[in-house]
A protein has these predicted regions:
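Glycine/Thr-rich beta-alpha phosphate-binding loop at enzyme active sites
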Residues: 47-57, 195-208, 241-301, 305, ...
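Glycine-rich phosphate-binding active-site loops on the catalytic face of alpha/beta enzymes
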Residues: 95-107, 190, 195-197, 255-262, ...
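Active-site beta->alpha loop and helix N-cap motifs at the rims of alpha/beta catalytic domains
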Residues: 117, 121, 125-192, 197-204
């Protein structure tokens, strides 16, 4: 009960401080990324300060989830949108079951021009629209970060999201990372293949060519025995998602992540060219949940395949409903940046079902 009270108090303080930071830093000119940068710096300070024990919550032992050869301490994992160690460390400290690094490309990229991430309202719900465009330090600068002891000491699965602008780039990045993983002791890694990103310039996705996707995953499986997750877009059709599942079901140690952010025009959520550099971007938030649940039911009723349900998951009720309908894990993004201290509260309720 004391842990619950502490989580609730931290939740209130976090939301108040976050709102104050956004008002003071991100409103004029409107650019949420400035508040995010400030928040990341503040979080880094807290994670190396004497206050760090305040953020530590034990995870109930009876909510572990086994997916292939990996054991997740909680069915809640982070979606692939961050790679700074302090954030990933904090989320594990508060009780997340596993983490996923944001998408890695072969070469460094600054992504799209700012402003490229904003708070919006969609269908009456809080949401975030981003057109980051996959900013990345590149695979060679990413490799030394992988075996960070602050993250591996939790002994929870760590996902690595892999992207590419071509078949060859996906294969090159995967090969470089897998070769590096074979040189380190920590073994709880898995791969997430990002075949759909709604805010890149050419708009092309590997999901548009399922034969190439099949050939790519076969090559991945020839290289590595680690679990391979394919992340699909919420805009994918029923027929397409079932075809992806068919490919995965014929290979060992695979899973599907449903799904990514949803493409929305900036003007449809009240943003102008001054407040958003691209015509549209990827929407995350509560309004995605109904479609996430629908897709989980579709996949679970047709294939015996581990499912990670990502998109609009924002409460215990969401997590419970997804798990009850066939999801193995639930991925979170917006909740982790808006109120991460809901995680220990959700874990507690899951343990007392």
């Amino acid at each position: 009960m004391l842990n619950n009270l502490r989580a609730r108090l931290l939740s209130l303080k976090f939301r108040a401080i976050r709102r104050a930071v956004i008002i003071l830093i991100a409103k004029i000119p409107k650019d949420l990324e400035r508040a995010i940068t400030f928040g990341d710096a503040l979080n880094h300070f807290l994670m190396i300060s004497p206050f760090r024990p305040l953020f530590k919550f034990s995870v109930p032992k009876n909510i572990k989830v086994n997916v292939h050869d990996l054991t997740f301490d909680s069915p809640i994992i982070s979606a692939s949108f961050k790679d700074d160690v302090s954030s990933l460390f904090q989320w594990q400290l508060i009780g997340i079951g596993g983490i996923t690094y944001k998408t890695v490309l072969k070469m460094p990229s600054k992504g799209n021009l700012r402003p490229r991430i904003q708070e919006v309202s969609h269908d009456g719900n809080y949401a975030i629209l981003n057109s980051l465009g996959l900013p990345t330090k590149g695979v060679m600068k990413f490799l030394p970060q992988i075996n960070n002891k602050k993250l591996t000491k939790f002994n929870r699965p760590i996902g690595i999201s892999i992207g590419g602008n071509s078949f060859e780039e996906y294969l090159s990045v995967f090969s470089e990372i897998d070769h590096h993983l074979n040189t380190i002791d920590f073994s709880q890694f898995f791969y997430e293949i990002n075949i759909s990103c709604p805010n890149t310039d050419d708009g092309k996705c590997l999901s548009d060519d399922l034969e190439s996707l099949k050939n790519l995953i076969i090559k991945f499986r020839d290289i590595s025995s680690r679990m391979i997750v394919v992340k699909v877009s919420p805009d994918i059709t029923n027929e397409e998602v079932l075809k992806v599942c068919e490919i995965l079901s014929n290979l060992s140690k695979t899973a599907i992540n449903i799904g990514n952010t949803k493409y929305v025009k900036a003007s449809d959520v009240g943003l102008s060219q001054k407040t958003f550099s691209k015509e549209g971007g990827g929407l995350s938030g509560k309004s995605l949940y109904a479609n996430t649940l629908r897709m989980v039911k579709l996949v679970a009723s047709n294939y015996d395949l581990p499912i990670i349900a990502t998109g609009g998951v924002s409460s215990y009720d969401n997590v419970k409903e997804l798990l009850d309908n066939g999801a193995s894990l639930t991925g979170m993004a917006t909740l982790l940046v808006s109120d991460p201290f809901q995680i220990p509260l959700i874990n507690y309720r899951l343990s007392n079902e």
